[in-house]
Amino acid sequence: MKKESNGTTIVKNFMKSQGSVFIILLVMCIIASIFTDKFLSVSNLSNVLAQSVTCGIAAIGMTFVILTGGIDLSVGGCIVFSATIGTKLLSEGKVGVGTAIIIMLLLGVLVGVFNGFLITVLKMPAFIATLASSNVTAGLALYISMGKTIIGLPLEYSFIGLKKIAGVPFCVLLMICLYIVAYIVLKYTGYGRKVYATGSNRKSAWLSGINVRLIEFSVYVIQGVMSALVGVVLTSKLLTCTRACLKNKNCTKRMFYFPFHDKIKKKGGSLC
């Protein structure tokens, strides 16, 4: 018998564990297409996916956090904080598009490091630490922007949020790539196994030689980067930066629903 390739094995394992989700999605699409003729059109599906990109990207980082038994309430603050500073520098012509994006992502790392420090070093409960972090970062963003909408962003900045490749929005392709990378990391790498172990039983993970504090610290950094990336996507779509738009409560709620899939709850830890 011929051995199956690694790629085939990965696809089969993925469908075995997540197949039910795709079946439900397929049924929903069929029902929607019965009532609306244009539901399955390329343009409509692209728009639907594009609308879910921001919550979807943030949910990637939240999945890592929840799997370790933590929670991160600083997502909204991190988004508006990183986006405000990056777009302000960009609108004033102090940096280019590429530099502005890098600055936003680094600010996301900074917020993640701050959260990780509060939780793993100062031993603060994740709920309290990240809630405080959210208020601090949102307040800083409000101070920096003086409560005003940041406009005058260059047109080339819109390529992340509005550009399409073969009819598919670039931001959708970016989200899909990030999901594939996250799935491979969690399923097939030592780091992913350590994340699961930390969430399942911290003491057992520590006794087995896993640096639990480092793993927990790292997932908040990942969440910070994902949050900052959401800020990039949102501001590149609108070519403006407003606090009300970036700190969308409905999106924040939906972002928490993404990781609370039954399999993630079973494999991850309890919320702190």
Where are each of the predicted segments found?
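Transmembrane alpha-helical segments of polytopic membrane transport and secretion proteins
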Residues: 1-20, 31, 40, 267-269
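Hydrophobic alpha-helical transmembrane segments
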Residues: 18-23, 48, 56, 77-81, ...
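Hydrophobic core segments of alpha-helical transmembrane domains in multi-pass membrane transport
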Residues: 21-33, 62-63, 134-139, 174-184, ...
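Single transmembrane alpha-helix segments in multi-pass membrane proteins
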Residues: 26-93, 117-123, 252, 258-266
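Inter-helical junctions in multi-pass inner-membrane proteins, predominant
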Residues: 37-47, 186, 192, 220-256, ...
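Alpha-helical transmembrane segments within multi-pass membrane transporters and channels
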Residues: 94-134, 177
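Transmembrane helix-bundle core of multi-pass membrane transporters
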Residues: 122, 126-189, 215-218, 234-246, ...
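Membrane-helix/interface signature in polytopic inner-membrane proteins
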Residues: 181-221
